[in-house]
Amino acid sequence: MTARGLERWGALLLLPIFLTGCWDNFQMNQLAIVDALAVDYNRGQYHVVAEVFNTMAVPAPAQSSPTATGGSNHSSSVFLEGAGKTLGEALADVSASSSRHVFWASTQVLLLGTGALQQGLGPLFGTFLHYPQFRSTARVLAVPGSAQSALESDTSGMEITVAQEIRNQDRYLHHDLSQGWAPRLYDVMRWDTEHGRSMVLLSLEKKPESKMNPQFRMDQSLVIGPDGRARGSLPSHDAMAYLWITGRFSQGYVAAGCPAGAGQTTIYLTSVSARSHVVVQRGTVRGIHIRLTGTGKVAGPLCANLSGLNMAANRRMVSLTMQTVDWAEAHDADIFGWGQQIYRQTPELWNDMPGYWRSRFPHMPVSVTSHVTIVQGDEGRV
Amino acid sequence: MTGIVTDPDVLRDLRIRSANLIDEIEEVLFRNQLSRPLSANLTNNMAVIQGLTHQAADLQFTKFACRGGLQGAILFAIDFVNYELMVAGIVEPLTGLNWTQAEVGRPLLEQVAKTIAPVGGAEAVDNVKGALDSIWSGGAVVFLDGTSGAVSINVGKINKRSITRPVSEQVVMGPHAGFIEDGMTNLSLVRQRLKTPRLWIDRMQVGRHTRTAVYLLSLYGVTDGALVDEVKSRLCQINIDGVLDSNYLVELVKSDRWTIFPTVLRTERPDRVAAGLLEGRVAIIVDGSPLAIVAPATLPMMMTSAADYYQNWMVATFLRIVRYIALTASLLTPGLYVALTTYHQEAIPTPLLITMAAARSDVPLPAVGEVLLLMVLFDIIREAGARVPTGIGSALTIGGTLVVGQAAVRAGIISSPIIIVVAGIVIAVLAIPNPELVQAVRFATYPVILGGAILGVYGILFVTIGLALHLASLESFGVAYLSPAAPIRPTDFKDFIIRLPWFRQTTRPAQTGYTDVMRQGPRSS
């Protein structure tokens, strides 16, 4: 390596010294460690509430003794608030409201109120992208109404934070479900809006007069269009088909009508998978065909022979799937990622039809066939 | 032209010069006295020797008279001679002789040397220096009145302890003998392992006053002659007043003197010396030191324990990997702790971050202050523990543990996670087999901590790069310190981090054993 090259390498190595140093360090006890963040928009301003761990409530080893109760006099979290015309201003306001250094990197839950979602996701995530210390593994949840009300809890003395409670619900109750519903921030940031994809956000609701912490609500799940704005709430009966088609969940219960009007029975779907086939003819997308396959078993009364139940269950699954597709088309929300599929399969076709998909999707012919095999379950033996 | 000097600078200069001149004159006179021939006058000889040694309390003149009337004296150093042997072997035969005062001259001394000298041998002594040199080696010098010169008869007694286990390099499986302070015993321990005439031992004397015997060992045909010559030449160039331990020589002869890392191996184990010789290295045994020197040495050698070769090769390999992990951990962990807790908190999992932040909530010191305080405290306890008698050692351990582990945390001076970090590295550093490398790593930890405190992980990177460059720049008698890793030498990987079984180690290390490459014949592999 020449002397000039060495000089360049040396300069490159030395330059980062000016980017960091002892002047911007923070001791851990100077940090306000954020666990969750609620973002609302009203009266022309963004309102941000940060739930911060109250480290004083964590029993320090020096205090631990058989008689110590572990900081039960303290609430597990404190709340910092801020507002501003932009989200950046609001976050800066939150930082200014604390004497400690607000540490965003530990944010685990990001609650977005309806008002903020109506403003679109673009400004929200654009701001987070400019906060390099903001960890992109935070779970993004939608809150019908005010996100702040869902986050703030008046149950003082709680040993866990609201965000921890939400994570526990996710972990113990809805883990599999929330995989597809409550994406992490990096999923949202990688969200393929360019190819017309819409997104579904699981919603969280706190009942107005309840002492309980906020709970997951499937029937209020918000659909965000490619423009980053809320398109509406996905009906709960459509949720299951959405999960099948997107391959995020393969189980569920469906009610199937018994043949000859003998009432209804319940079918437990043990494994369902869907395959979407985009039909392209003469350089045009002619339609989408969805093929459902898998297995299920009778979980309710065995009201007919299995062959009859098979037909009834498959009919029901086709109708459920069509219902969901119809909802998506009606709301102009490609939540299934078919635009993305076309782009991946035939990029040249996608490039030849700029703007075509946005206008075509609401009228796209869709057909569904179901080949789910139903077997006799334990319930059916009775 | 004459005049009186009044300038104070000139006066001071003159005073210093005159003092130096007096010192030089005294030195010349002393040397003249030392090289003065022994006279025929017994009283005169005694007076000169007593004057030169300032009547040293451990020197004794014992006068005797032969049956025939001839006067004589024996000069010896107390506790350097076997007293019973001297009386029975020298004094009694001499006093029984019928020599008279008239029978003076050289033949008498020759007769003494030939007839009554015990098994140890005798030699003629002509001057005062010779007489004094011989008594420190266990000789009894016989003077006869009227006869110039003297004869030194070896009746030496060696004060030495028995062979014990090596203190710093113990193994569970394998030989347990360790070197002691006696050079000849140490040589015999090596000789027991290398019973070959190819083991060449050169004797030298180093130290103007201590006159310490230094033995240079090499294996003829295996060790490179140039290496032997180089070591010999460096030893010969030493002009020091005294050598009390092998470390004196290490600092005087090693290639890179301004480094804390050991560039020669000092070992208490004769088997390691023998192994080093078989690899084409040289060994130096210093009389009075239980630590032999093996050179050239590399960093991987320092990470090798003698036990590696006395157990299953796969186990030995695993243990070597563990040692390298311990080396890295003990070097980097405190610095990383400081960097992560001060600059890169986002790299810490949130639950751990909260626990650590809570633990630090009442601590007044910054993380770097905590780490440095505890590191220094541990070093003090360790240093104190190395000095105190065994009986007090346990009290010290309890005191140290209580003070550091409990009281300091309860008092809010330090947080509990830092105790785990520092205690962890205190234990980890002990996994390094070489005590000198342990000390070097302990020392090198501090720059890493400071680098982490000033620039975070980037600072640690800087210090680590600097450390790596320093290590790569070191050499030991022409061998790169990091070899076979840098410069890379794949043929020597057989005994680097992985220790291949003996049937795969057919050649000597390329860096030292190039004179006789093959270690095993075709049959054994």
Would you name each region that the model predicts?
Chain A
Residues 2-10, 16-382:
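Membrane-proximal alpha-helical signals and transmembrane carboxylates
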